[in-house]
């Protein structure tokens, strides 16, 4: 087993890889110097399986070590997105994912578009949706309000909606995922990790694979 880390940072003087056992607190268990490679990249090969570990990159420039970063290409992170995570991607795909296909669209003029915010869509106490404010709310069917009216996806189908435009789903900065009970709100236009789903919409922001 081998783990390979690569970072493009052509202006760096040195780069180190910080390895952690936690996605949130604690000092690094290891700090490893990376080697300069081709085309402005830095790389390190570690001869063991690091699944379950967390990591950051840290750049030295002009004698000063800059703040740690998970890297802009991180696809899995710990709580609040400060540390990237090493995961097994085979564990993230739901059943049937590889064979899933979108419906055929014959004419763009057939589109009836609905803009949707993950939290707003389901957070109302009377939505009848179990996973209020979460990604999973978009998987629930058969939900109803106390008055018996359809809610969630069923309501959109009744409206004749064919396509949903979802507001930012990526990991954004202003919601503290440790304090979701504070009910803080944001549309999501303050990106932190572009390639990671936001933890506040996950049922477990601590576990990297849960939000994916």
Feature-to-residue mapping (PLM):
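Conserved residues at the C-terminal ends of beta-strands
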Residues: 18, 119, 167, 197
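Beta-strand signatures of extracellular beta-sandwich domains
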Residues: 16-18, 58
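The feature marks proteins involved in alpha-glucan
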Residues: 1, 28, 36-141
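Structural beta-strand segments of beta-rich domains
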Residues: 3-6
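Carboxylate/His-rich catalytic cores and anion/metal-binding grooves
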Residues: 156-183
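Short proline/glycine-enriched turn/loop motifs at strand-loop junctions of beta-rich domains
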Residues: 8-15, 50
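Phosphate-binding active sites in nucleotide-utilizing proteins
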Residues: 118-120, 124-125, 131-149, 154-165, ...
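Aromatic- and acidic-residue-enriched carbohydrate-binding clefts of CAZyme catalytic domains
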Residues: 127-144, 176-212
């Amino acid at each position: 087993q081998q783990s390979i880390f690569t970072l493009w940072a052509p202006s760096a003087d040195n780069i180190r890889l910080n390895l952690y056992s936690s996605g949130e607190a604690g000092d690094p268990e290891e700090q490893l110097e990376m080697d300069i490679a081709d085309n402005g990249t830095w790389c390190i090969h570690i001869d063991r399986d690091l699944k379950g570990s967390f990591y950051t990159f840290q750049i030295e420039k002009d004698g000063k070590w800059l703040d740690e970063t998970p890297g802009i290409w991180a696809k899995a992170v710990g709580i609040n997105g400060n540390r990237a995570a090493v995961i097994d991607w085979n564990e993230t795909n739901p059943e049937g994912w590889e064979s899933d296909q979108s419906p055929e669209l014959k004419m763009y003029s057939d589109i009836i578009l609905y803009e949707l915010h993950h939290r707003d869509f389901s957070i109302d106490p009377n939505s009848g949706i179990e996973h209020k404010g979460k990604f999973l709310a978009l998987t629930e069917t058969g939900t109803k309000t106390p008055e018996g009216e359809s809610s969630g996806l069923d309501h959109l189908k009744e409206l004749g909606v064919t396509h949903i435009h979802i507001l930012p789903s990526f990991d954004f900065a202003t919601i503290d995922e440790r304090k979701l009970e504070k009910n803080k709100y944001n549309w999501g236009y303050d990106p932190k990790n572009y390639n990671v789903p936001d933890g506040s919409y996950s049922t477990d922001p601590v576990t990297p694979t849960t939000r994916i």
